[in-house]
């Protein structure tokens, strides 16, 4: 399970270092292989351990190729999906295309989301989290059926 927010630098080759606390698990359970793709709703990237990505792929495969919206989702998520193998130093390479999509520069935020990470450009993350926190007490959130029984 991935949790927390970590500020990470991108080196001049486009590599990021996975935080040390996750490396052993990723190597042991996923052979150090991750898959990075774009988020279809946000200007960020999604980084999955390979086995988690394979579950997502099955869901994408189940979508209809004949429905234009479903086909678009397949095209974007699968089309951008790139395998990233951790090197001996725990780094992965983010392709220029992926970095461009999320407008990644020198400093990024790696955000644990249980079964995956989100990768955000640091200023975009600050803006998004401020918006998310402001929504906390809104009528929209209070009326959301899926959240009515959520107890934290």
UniProtKB/Swiss-Prot annotation:
It comes from the Bacteria. InterPro entries: MraZ, MraZ_C, MraZ_dom, MraZ_N, MraZ_sf, SpoVT-AbrB_dom, SpoVT-AbrB_sf. One of its GO terms (molecular function) is transcription cis-regulatory region binding. Keywords: Cytoplasm, DNA-binding, Repeat, Transcription, Transcription regulation. CDD domains: MraZ_C, MraZ_N. Pfam families: MraZ (PF02381). SUPFAM superfamilies: AbrB/MazE/MraZ-like. It is found in: Cytoplasm, Nucleoid. Disulfide bonds: none annotated. Signal peptide: none annotated. PROSITE patterns: SPOVT_ABRB. GO terms for cellular component: cytoplasm; nucleoid. Residues 5-52, 81-124 form the SpoVT-AbrB domain. GO terms for biological process: negative regulation of DNA-templated transcription initiation. PANTHER family: TRANSCRIPTIONAL REGULATOR MRAZ. Belongs to the MraZ family. Forms oligomers. This is Transcriptional regulator MraZ.
